[in-house]
Amino acid sequence: MSALRGLRILVVENDEMNATLLELQLAQAGAAVIGPAESVRQALALIEQERPDRAVLDFRLAAGETSEAVARMLTEHAIPYVLATGVAAESLPPGFAAGVVLTKPYLSEQLIKALGDAHAKMTARP
């Protein structure tokens, strides 16, 4: 599977097992993985330093943080992202509106499709 070949994808996930699984899914699809970032601070630094092509975020991070500030920065830089979460889409803050919500658990094919949908959504923005 090479659906993501050549793409550099930032992973923002504080759970080690989830991060490892996500990295494996992305690598098997041909992506180069950046991260994982476990905190907002790490994620913001990686966005500035690495300029990823796309990103996959978890909603809840370490120390009670959420990834909303990360989503805002990705939107400012026109970087498409997927919010992979167990939180219901209708209860998410508006800061995630530019991304695509993918409900956990999900299959690799659903992740790849969501990343494509995120790209289409971001490029369609005015």
Roles of regions detected by a PLM:
Residues 1-8, 41, 107-126:
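Non-catalytic signal-transmission and effector/linker regions of two-component phosphorelay proteins
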Residues 84-85:
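Hydrophobic/aromatic residues positioned on beta-strands within the core alpha/beta folds
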Residues 104:
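A Lys-centered signature of the CheY-like receiver
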Residues 13:
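Conserved acidic carboxylate
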Residues 36-54:
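Acidic, metal-coordinating helix/loop segments flanking the phosphotransfer/catalytic sites
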Residues 48-50, 73-79, 90:
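Conserved phosphotransfer cores of two-component systems
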Residues 16-35:
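Two-component/phosphorelay signaling modules centered on CheY-like receiver
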Residues 57-75:
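Conserved phosphotransfer microenvironments
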